């Protein structure tokens, strides 16, 4: 604020001198802090799993702050120490309380900026500490022909400590002891991953479950389920006791047609809240968790223009709070609700004139902002992506004209860009669209066998062989006879083979594919809308099939031992399997061919081994335990007599034995004289 010289006069007419300038800055913007972590040298990503005993935390504020202290930091599953810093940068050490899920968060109103604006909450940092190395578990088995051994590990494993790479033959080593068999090589001759199977169990029977979401709602280190029971007008959650036994609890009731839920810490206070789109009431709600799983209903929008169809939560505008994307039916619009950091929301349009399924929000073009991929329905269904210009203004781009179903976005062919996996309901196809790196897409077929109305798609490494597989649920409206959940095994070159998870469900409209039982492989949980049931499918690992070669034939008393080689097999946290294991031995099958020699006299009476008779000749029978084509009279050694009239094939041969004089005789076949068909 300034007054220039000569702008006014006093009563005598003298002009004023320049005023002393008054300078002032208005700042009504609340500060916030971003939480990041390293293991001391390498960055640790939010929502990751590592084996670090501690994390080095950095708290970076968007401006200088005051009053920020160690007591402002909220945690579960661990504690902070060694806090220091000033201005806009602070550090601390986080130590987990055990091998478990952990979280670090900063609630609102705990510190201020220089003008004394109270802080906003921070996006929590979630991390799992895992120091348990993978082990070989029970179930090691041998093929009948001694050519392969199958070993199962306690968790999903990789060839590198960065959580990537399929296992190789050099990651295992063999040894053998006892018997006559010997190994041609201590290294497996081949390695392949056997397909998993799925064991299903019914979790609950809510009335009209529209979907199921999975989260550790009570922060007790296991996965719980959130279910909107549409026909019962209630939102339920199912508490896991840690052994996949579930107890039903209530989130909220008295709502007309809950269609979708999304669990997230919306108010950034360290516990899990739930956002929900309500179909009949046309409401957008969130349920605030008090930290003890008692929920208070909060209204975001009580007058949606259409029926609430889906919702998801993400920091769409990158301002360190959580916004909400909502799709509605009958008015055909897609909107996002901008959070001001205090859970007060402003509605913004993404697009109108179309209905849509739940969008995938991802930086598809990798330009630093969040785009959307979705199915739109406006007289002709289309697969589109909506490009964000960086200011949350979206431009529609067509991917394909195929009809609707579930979709996922992932780098399926692992070439460094995002592809789209989707279903074409009219043609009964499951497709994937390869991105050329510039968001131009080429359609490829995964399944064209008639999967009608594919309501949900899942993607991930289901069989643990290092590539991305696909799962799909068919919800046909024709009853349980036509409905199913299947998965498609990727051979590593995006050629897929279908396997069945479940048939006989009644409209499995939605499922999730994630680790539910804590063994780091991908299980499933499904919601059957018409069948009124929630089912859990445990992924039962098929194991690794290791080929081996023997240089000498075993007699059945050999012990074959298989162990990981040193620093070769890792879990996702980076723990290496030990070179010394249990449950890692098998006894080889006897592959030596036995030969039984029997005799009868001229009256066809048996002559026993070691007996004395006055028979002038014996008819001798040679019976092999396996068919042979190269057993000949020359393979038989005799003393005290001679063989004649030798004949036979397969496993049975005969000859006539004539002694040369009174006295002892022998008839024998030495080891290694002949072979079976396999050599």
Q: Where are these predicted regions, by residue range?
A:
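Non-catalytic beta-sheet/beta-sandwich ligand-binding modules that flank or precede catalytic cores
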Residues: 1-195, 541-679
């Amino acid at each position: 604020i300034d007054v220039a010289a000569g702008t006014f006069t006093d009563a005598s007419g003298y002009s004023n001198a320049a005023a002393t300038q008054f300078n002032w800055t208005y700042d009504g913007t609340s500060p916030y802090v971003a939480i990041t972590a390293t293991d001391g040298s390498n960055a640790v990503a939010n929502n990751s799993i590592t084996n670090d005993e501690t994390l080095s935390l950095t708290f970076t504020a968007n401006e200088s702050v005051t009053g920020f202290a160690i007591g402002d930091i909220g945690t579960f599953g661990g504690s902070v120490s060694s806090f220091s810093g000033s201005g806009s940068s602070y550090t601390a050490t986080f130590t987990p309380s055990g091998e478990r899920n952990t979280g670090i968060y900063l609630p609102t109103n705990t510190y201020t900026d220089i003008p004394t604006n109270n802080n906003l909450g921070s996006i929590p940092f979630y991390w799992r500490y895992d120091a348990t190395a993978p082990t070989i578990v029970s179930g090691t088995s041998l093929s009948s022909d001694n050519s392969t051994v199958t070993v199962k590990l306690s968790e999903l494993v990789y060839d590198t400590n960065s959580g990537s790479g399929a296992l190789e033959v050099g990651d295992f080593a063999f040894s053998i002891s006892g018997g006559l068999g010997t190994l041609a090589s201590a290294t497996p001759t081949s390695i392949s991953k056997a397909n998993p199977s799925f064991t299903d169990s019914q979790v609950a029977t809510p009335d009209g479950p529209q979907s199921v979401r999975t989260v550790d709602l009570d922060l007790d280190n296991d996965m719980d389920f959130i279910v909107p029971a549409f026909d019962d007008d209630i939102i339920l959650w199912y508490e896991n006791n840690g052994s996949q036994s579930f107890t039903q609890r209530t989130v909220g009731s008295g709502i007309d047609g809950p269609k979708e839920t999304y669990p997230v810490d919306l108010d950034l206070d360290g516990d899990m809240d739930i956002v929900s789109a309500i179909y009949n009431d046309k409401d957008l709600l969130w349920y605030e968790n008090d930290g003890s799983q008692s929920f208070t209903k909060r209204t975001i929008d009580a007058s949606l223009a259409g029926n609430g169809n889906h919702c998801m939560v993400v920091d769409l505008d990158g301002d360190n709070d959580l916004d909400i994307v909502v799709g509605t039916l009958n008015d055909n619009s897609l909107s996002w609700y901008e959070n001001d950091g205090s859970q007060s929301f402003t509605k913004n349009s993404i697009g109108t004139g179309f209905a849509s399924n739940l969008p995938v929000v991802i930086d598809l073009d990798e330009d630093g902002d969040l785009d959307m991929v979705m199915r739109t329905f406006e007289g002709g269904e289309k697969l589109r992506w909506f490009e964000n210009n960086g200011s949350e203004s979206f431009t529609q781009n067509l991917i394909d004209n195929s009809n609707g179903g579930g979709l996922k976005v992932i780098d399926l062919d692992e070439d460094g860009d995002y592809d789209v996996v989707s279903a074409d309901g009219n043609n009964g196809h499951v497709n994937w669209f390869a991105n050329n790196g510039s968001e131009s897409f080429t359609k490829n077929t995964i399944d064209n066998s008639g999967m009608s109305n594919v309501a949900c798609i899942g993607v991930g490494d289901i069989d643990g062989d290092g590539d991305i597989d696909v799962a799909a649920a068919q919800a046909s409206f024709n009853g349980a006879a036509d409905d199913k959940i299947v998965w498609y095994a990727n051979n590593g070159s995006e050629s897929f083979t279908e396997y069945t998870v479940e048939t006989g469900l009644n409209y499995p409209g939605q499922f999730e594919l994630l680790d539910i039982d804590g063994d780091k492989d991908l299980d499933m949980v499904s919601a059957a809308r018409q069948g009124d049931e929630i089912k859990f499918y445990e992924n039962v690992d098929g194991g690794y099939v290791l080929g081996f070669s023997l240089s000498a034939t075993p007699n059945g008393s050999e012990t074959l031992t298989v162990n990981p080689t040193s620093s070769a097999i890792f879990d996702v946290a980076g723990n290496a399997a030990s070179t010394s294991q249990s449950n890692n031995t098998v006894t080889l099958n006897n592959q030596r061919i036995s030969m039984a020699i029997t005799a009868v006299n001229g009256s066809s009476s048996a002559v026993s081994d070691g007996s004395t008779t006055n028979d002038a000749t014996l008819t001798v029978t040679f019976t092999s335990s396996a068919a042979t084509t190269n057993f000949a009279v020359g393979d038989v050694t005799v003393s005290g007599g001679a063989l004649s009239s030798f004949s036979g094939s397969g496993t049975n041969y005969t000859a006539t034995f004539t002694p040369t004089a009174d006295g002892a005789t022998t008839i024998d076949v030495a080891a290694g004289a002949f072979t079976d068909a396999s050599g």
